[in-house]
Structure formats: C-alpha cells, structure tokens
Amino acid sequence: MAELDDALYERIGALSEAGDALVEDGDYAGALEKYWQAFALLPEPRTNWEAGTWLMAAVGDTNFHQGDYEAGRDNLGHAMHFPDAIGNPFLHLRLGQCQFELGNLDRAADELMRAYMGGGPELFEDEDDKYLRFLGTRAEGIKAP
C-alpha cells in the first residue's frame, strides 16, 4: 500500500488531532470542519489511503455523537470503501448504531453483529445498553446487561 509523504501525513494528523480536541470540547461542527480539511488533503483516489479510513471514522463518529444519524450512516458507509475498514469493529458498531436510530433494524442487526463478532461484548461497554439488548433479540447467546 502506498504511503503519504511525511509532511502531508503530519498536516493531516495535526488537523485530525485538532478535530479530536474539538470533539472533546463538544464543538462537533468545528471538529467536522477540521476532519474535512484533512480529508481534502488526501491525494486522489482518496479511497486508497489508510488515513482516509480513520478520517471517515472520525467524521461518522462525530455525526453519531451530534445525533445526525443520516450523515453518520452515509459517511460510515462510505468509509467501508477505504483500506481495512470492512471488519473494523468500531466502524461496524457506529454504522449499526446509526442504522438502529434511523429505524433500519435489519441493517442495524447486521452491522452490530459484525461489531460484536469482531470486538466482543467489551466493545459495547461504554455504549447505551439498548444496542446490545436489541442485538440480543436478533441473535442467540448475546448477553445484554
């Protein structure tokens, strides 16, 4: 896999870290602006870059936390076209949560099961119990709190 040159990688990383700090402060709009600025620096085709995976994950996670589940679904779905995204438990968790909140329960169950299989019940520990309870209604052996 090709790698970004060091200077570009550092610029992207700095913008991403700035976005992360804004998320910590609850400034989701500001964070999204930083993440998209970083994403715009990726050379085309952007889907070739591992940095694109974590940037799209950050965007989708931020969408989820701000309650913009449609954008979260769309951005996390797009993230699946980037390196090492399919099978990433966190990406599947957030995509499943967005699908759940949008009422797309079959898709939610599929994504949440992928998250559970890849990350185990520990992945759900800091999440609202409703997601694991829901998954327990769709699959045997899922222990909900």
Q: How does the language model describe each region?
A:
Residues A38-L42, R73-H81, Y116-G119:
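Amphipathic alpha-helical segments of tetratricopeptide repeats
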Residues Y28-A29, Y69, L105:
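TPR-repeat structural position
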Residues A2-D5, L42-W49, M80-A85, E122:
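Flexible helix-coil transition and linker loops at the boundaries of alpha-helical arrays
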Residues F39, F100-L123:
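TPR/TPR-like (Sel1-like) alpha-helical repeat modules
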